[in-house]
């Protein structure tokens, strides 16, 4: 997730924050978590990974939960649920019906292990539509990641002809009518990251 955090930091620098607070509403039903408190955060500083709370809620005896998330703009929001680190992208003035993963608490060994890292999971959203930022990013990542590893491997092997431009054009044709600036910045940064990585790998292979 480190690269994703860099993507998000870059986008935040481009877009900037407004001076007033807005809200997104999250809600759902998760009987597995009844009686638990769920806290949501965002990274107020991506370089130092500073986590700042943006909202919290209690899951009642019926498994129902809801919370107001304080955000300024499209924001990467996350929370810790046992072995999972769930995340999604929240936009102001929207409502998200979350589908939480089955509850799985950390074992004692995991809890005491300073190197244990939660499994990062993009949380399900039951009321998502195809124009939502979560749907767009997820669909893009699936297409992009299908080719990312192979292109990087080809670059490391010193292959002269790489399919970066054709990959970018192929993906962009599917999103050419998308108006979401956050999503546009996200895609462009991922493309730039791919080009940097392949350039580095090719340089390394040549020097060796």
Region locations from a protein language model:
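A non-transmembrane, solvent-exposed segment enriched in polar/low-complexity residues
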Residues: 22-182, 186-189, 193-207
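Bacterial Sec-dependent N-terminal signal peptides
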Residues: 1-28
């Amino acid at each position: 997730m480190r690269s994703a955090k860099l993507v998000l930091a870059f986008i935040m620098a481009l877009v900037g924050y407004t001076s007033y607070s807005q809200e997104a509403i999250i809600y759902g039903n998760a009987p597995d978590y009844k009686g638990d408190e769920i806290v949501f955060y965002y990274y107020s500083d991506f370089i130092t990974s500073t986590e700042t709370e943006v909202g919290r809620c209690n899951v009642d005896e019926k498994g129902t939960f809801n919370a107001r998330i304080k955000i300024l703009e499209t924001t990467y929001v996350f929370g810790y649920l046992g072995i999972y680190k769930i995340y999604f992208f929240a936009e102001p003035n929207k409502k998200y019906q979350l589908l939480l993963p089955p509850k799985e608490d950390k074992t004692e060994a995991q809890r005491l292990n300073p190197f244990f890292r939660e499994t990062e999971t993009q949380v399900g959203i039951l009321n998502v539509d195809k124009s939502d930022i979560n749907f767009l990013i997820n669909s893009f990542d699936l297409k992009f990641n299908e080719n990312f590893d192979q292109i990087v491997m080809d670059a490391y092997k010193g292959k002269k002809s790489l399919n970066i431009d054709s990959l970018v054009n192929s993906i962009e044709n599917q999103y050419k009518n998308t108006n979401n600036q956050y999503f546009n910045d996200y895609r462009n940064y991922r493309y730039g990251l791919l080009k940097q990585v392949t350039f580095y790998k090719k340089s390394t292979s040549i020097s060796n």
